[in-house]
């Protein structure tokens, strides 16, 4: 086996091509994984449309949310809990971090390591070629930590845990405890927002209010634990949306706001937050001006980038232990074979689906 099929971006904003890409020799400690499922993320859509960041170049294999089965390992490896892994084990894995810089070794924040590297934007015409997840196989560098997937968790949900869900867990990790009388507002009803809705409800929020669009995503949010939802398409005025939140909070505003939409939603979220409240900023993209007049109100503002390795474990544990409480599979709302990747990306871009998954024969 010298090569495999992959979905390759060869030109921005043009249909991806299904091309054969070399399967590389494994350096010591590297792993070759046969992909079972790769969920798509809004970031994949942004990279497809462009522009690329200065470090990126065409062509590249799209996708950065993989789950797969180990095909081969060059040497011996253990998972993040120290247990041996081998061919046939179903895993997800972390990004690359150097392990020796200040952020990795002293601050213990590898998510901001200057040498951090992730997937879905790496040149597919240069070794090690297979660094995108919408492919039959993927190369896992030796620096990556391996996380075994519990039997109770589907491959599609595990793939989503490899980016979207672990980022949400990072946000809740930074937020800390939710007090039972608190009202939590979730800004965004995509995969991150609906997962955050479930986590907030599970952690004891008195009331979870989810704001987003379109209606099909909000319907999922209600089944994920939202006590009330507000459709942005139906309520277009910001003041009306702020008033809606205040109606549920005796005029004070929310105790916690978790923004999982984009930067433009942050000023709106701050307007919904009570004095002394806590704000978690996860969603990125776009530009916004932060209203500094809110800062004297003793707010606590957390920003979140990606996740730490423990957050993969936390996301998988939540999926496993709460599978009978929340309908996680509803968030993976459409499945496509590799040949239909362009259809999947278009459905994601137009919000027709909450989160699509590309599946591969096992």
Model-inferred region functions:
Residues 186-189, 201-266:
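Adenosine-nucleotide cofactor-binding segment
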Residues 1-2, 256, 260, 267, ...:
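C-terminal hydrophobic helical "lid"/dimerization subdomain
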Residues 277-278:
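Glycine-centered, small-residue-biased loops immediately flanking beta-strands
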Residues 238-243, 285-333, 342-343, 352-353:
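C-terminal substrate-binding/catalytic core of Rossmann-like NAD(P)-dependent dehydrogenases/reductases
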Residues 173-179, 202, 248-251, 271:
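Glycine-rich helix-loop-beta junction characteristic of Rossmann-like nucleotide cofactor-binding loops
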Residues 24-38, 52-105, 150-152:
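Glycine-rich beta-strand-centered segment in the early N-terminal region that forms part
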Residues 98-187, 326:
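NAD(P)H dinucleotide-binding glycine-rich loop of Rossmann-like/cofactor-binding domains
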Residues 167, 192, 216:
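Hydrophobic/small residue at the entry helix of a nucleotide-binding pocket
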């Amino acid at each position: 086996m010298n090569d495999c099929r992959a979905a390759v971006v060869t030109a921005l904003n043009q249909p991806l091509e299904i091309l054969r890409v070399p399967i590389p020799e494994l350096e010591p400690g590297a792993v070759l994984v046969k992909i079972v499922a790769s969920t798509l993320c809004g970031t994949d859509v942004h990279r497809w449309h462009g522009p690329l960041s200065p470090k990126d170049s065409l062509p590249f294999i799209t996708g950065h949310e993989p789950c797969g089965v180990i095909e081969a390992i060059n040497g011996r490896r253990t998972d993040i809990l120290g247990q041996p892994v081998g061919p046939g084990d179903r895993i997800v894995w972390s990004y690359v971090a150097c392990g020796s810089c200040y952020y990795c070794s002293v601050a213990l924040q590898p998510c901001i390591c200057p040498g951090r590297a992730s997937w879905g934007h790496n040149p597919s015409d240069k070794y090690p070629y297979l660094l995108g997840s919408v492919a039959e196989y993927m190369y896992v560098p030796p620096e990556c930590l391996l996380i075994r997937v519990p039997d109770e968790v589907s491959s599609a949900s595990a793939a989503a845990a490899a980016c979207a869900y672990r980022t949400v867990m990072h946000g809740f990790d930074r937020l800390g405890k939710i007090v039972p009388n608190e009202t939590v507002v979730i800004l965004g009803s995509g995969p991150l927002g609906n997962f955050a809705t479930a986590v907030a409800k599970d952690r004891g929020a008195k009331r979870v209010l989810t704001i987003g669009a379109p209606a099909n995503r909000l319907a999922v949010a209600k089944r994920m634990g939202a006590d009330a939802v507000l459709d942005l398409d139906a309520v277009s005025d910001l003041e009306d949306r702020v008033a809606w939140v205040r109606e549920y909070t005796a005029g004070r505003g929310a105790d916690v706001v978790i923004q999982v939409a984009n930067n433009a939603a942050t000023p709106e979220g701050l307007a919904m937050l009570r004095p002394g409240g806590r704000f978690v900023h996860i969603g990125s993209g776009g530009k916004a001006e932060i209203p500094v007049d809110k800062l004297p109100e003793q707010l606590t503002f957390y920003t979140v980038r990606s996740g730490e390795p423990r957050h993969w474990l936390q996301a998988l544990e939540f999926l496993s232990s709460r599978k009978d409480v929340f309908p996680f599979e509803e968030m993976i709302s459409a499945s496509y074979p590799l040949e239909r990747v362009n259809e999947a990306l278009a459905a994601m871009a137009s919000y027709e689906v909450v989160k699509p998954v590309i599946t591969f024969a096992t």
